[in-house]
Structure formats: C-alpha cells, structure tokens
Amino acid sequence: MTLSYPIASNAAHPPRLSPAYKSTVKRSPQKPLIIMRHTLSELTGPVYGQEAVRESDHDLTTQHKGEPLGERIIVHGHVLDEDGRGVPNTLVEIWQANACGRYIHVVDQHPAPLDPNFTGAGRAQSDSEGYYRFVTVKPGAYPWGNHHNAWRPAHIHFSVFGHSFISRLVTQMYFPGDPLFEFDPIFNSVTDEKARMRMVSSFDLENTQPGWALCYRFNIILRGRAATPMETK
C-alpha cells in the first residue's frame, strides 16, 4: 500500500497567483506544471555553500569591523516535524533588510541608507533537538511599489533545507503587532488567519538578554495541520 501525504489547502499556503500581489500576475505559471525526475549525484546532499557552516555565521552583528545600527535582537526556535519532534542538522538560512528597511541589492534603490556594517544574511545548523539561533538587528519596513503607499511589514526571510538542495522551503517571519499587516497583500495571500499567524514570531521575555537584546521565538513546522506557511513560487 502506498501512502501519499495530502497537499495542504490553498488557505494555508499562498497561491502562485494572488492578483493583489501584482508581480504574481506575471510570474505565476500559465500552463500545467511538469514533474521533473530527480537523479542522484555527488551533489545531492547539502554542501552549505562553498564551506561548512561556521560557528559565527548565525551572528549577523559581527560580520564586519563595526557593529550595525539598529535594535539588536535574538531570533530562535526549533525546526519541527508534524508531531512536534525536532529535526536535527537542518540548514537554516536568513536574509533581511537593515534597520532602515534597505537590502544590499542592486535592485533596492529606495532612499534609505545602507549600513556598511550589515550585510543582512546568516545561516545556522539546527542541533540534535532541532534548535537554531540567530543574532541580528530588527529590520525596518520599506516601500515596494505594489500599489499606492505600499509598505512591507518588518520581516525576515527564512530558508530551510532538507537532506538535498531540492528539498528547500522558504517562508517569512514577521513581528507581533505590526500595524502594516492588514495592508500587506503578501502576508494576506495566506487566507487562513490561523496559518497567517504562524508566520508571526512571539516575543520571548524569558530568553531576552537584559541590557543587551530582546528575543523573539519562531518555530518552523515543516508539515501537518500546524505547518508554517511556505512560499509556492
């Protein structure tokens, strides 16, 4: 007997086409999808970029000579399966805008300053219990031109790799209480309210370091009814 895992409902994950998110109109597939056969090779397993994950890769505030501007924060949590068990040795990558809401990217030219001490990218490997931890600065909101006076809520992009690089899930983590939630078509492309809130981190006073950094918890649940919504593009 062959058991297939059920595909999650469209309400729990963003659709490929969400007209309010205007760029999906051009990017979403217009023809039936084609299944590509996967063949094994020596590059099937994770190679973590060009070298192994270093102990300091999780700290985005120590990658340059000076300390970046902005509010220092800790972001941590667990990568979990549907039964709440930690998934060990998982490559977790993040990328984000700086405290002024600007990315180090040639396409991002909106009038906000770049920070020479902040690149905005980090990576970590989950431990034996599926736990990961990052130190970074809280990203700023930024305009993005989707519609009149369009601003993205503060967020951090997450990428989670499975046992091969074709097993990659991408999502975004938001911060609690952001007033921009109701105006953001990307956040609201996940139509199930409970699923949307699984993309919102929780403030973690217990793990806040007094006098140094606030802490936010963000658990990534890979599948099941409580799965973290993932991008489908």
PLM regions and their residue ranges:
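Beta-strand-dominated extracellular/periplasmic modules and repeats
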Residues: 2-233
